From Swiss-Prot:
Protein's organism: Gallus gallus (Chicken)
SUPFAM superfamilies in alphabetical order: Homeodomain-like
Molecular function GO terms recorded: DNA-binding transcription factor activity, RNA polymerase II-specific; RNA polymerase II cis-regulatory region sequence-specific DNA binding
Superkingdom of the source species: Eukaryota
Protein name (database record): Paired box protein Pax-9
GO biological process: regulation of transcription by RNA polymerase II
Residues covered by region (RED subdomain): 80-128
Keyword DNA-binding appears in the UniProt entry: yes
Annotated keywords: Developmental protein, DNA-binding, Nucleus, Paired box, Transcription, Transcription regulation
SMART domains for this protein: PAX (SM00351)
InterPro entries reported in the protein's UniProt record: Homeodomain-like_sf, PAIRED_DNA-bd_dom, Paired_dom, PAX_fam, WH-like_DNA-bd_sf
UniProt-listed Pfam families: PAX (PF00292)
Known DNA-binding region: 2-128
Amino acid sequence: PAFGEVNQLGGVFVNGRPLPNAIRLRIVELAQLGIRPCDISRQLRVSHGCVSKILARYNETGSILPGAIGGSKPRVTTPTVVKHIRTYKQRDPGIFAWEIRDRLLADGVCDKYNVPSVSSISRILRNKIGNLSQQGHYESYKQHQPPPQPPLPYNHIYSYPSPIAAAGAKVPTPPGVPAIPGTMAMPRTWPSSHSVTDILGIRSITDQVSDTSSYPSPKVEEWSSLGRSSFPPAAQHAVNGLEKSSLEQEAKYSQAHNGLPAVGSFVSAPAMSPYATSAQVSPYMPYSAAPSSYMAGHGWQHTAGTPLSPHGCDLPASLAFKGVQTAREGSHSVTASAL
């Protein structure tokens, strides 16, 4: 031929291509005549390795044709095997590939010659059965999944949880708008959709517990609608050894207007200074009226004590300790009589 290479014996061959069938047949015929392989190699100008390989294959298979001996391995992942593997996986989702291989042999589905390898079983589980099992888990998850919650209502700043919005009784009030008193106020806690209570769903439980409590507390928005007079005094102070009752607190906060903006939602009432009015009247200024016409006859005054007049009126020297409710009743009566 016009192309090829020359070996050490002077013969021509093409690298990577099989020896022609005519030369192969001639090698077999000379071998059957009893000629040694080395002599056949010199006579036909074919390498000794090629002659030996052709003769060995002929003695083994009886064929002189080139190609792989025996062909490829027969297919072991038949539909029957895949079906049994799927059954094993559905019965025991945590089964291993080597356990499936042993069970295929134990159940007689395969024998030791055609049983799939562990890697083949893993590939079947990953490609053919994995999607089916995931789809089955998804379908079962959808069946056991509760109905979806309604979308969260959106406010201009914060989004509120759906249990509060679904109640319909607690509507958030944006800043600058007069607060809605009563049951239309928002919850006591500042709403935030990223808090732990909202994520875990504890807010509705805490609201129910606090709503059924025996000590009702005013809501955040209700604070701004309530008058300053409704707050009890923060602390009881003593002036000249006497107990200063909530009368001073009443005198301070009774001058404040009730229609103030919703500042009380964020600042506690006792921490705020009294608002300026047109005429500042000190609760300590002396009165021109006679003591007998001003404070005589009230039930809380201790008549047995020695009266002192630091403010131009009769006050007892010592007062017995009373509860907050008694002090508030007395302060209301004094305020009414003073007005």
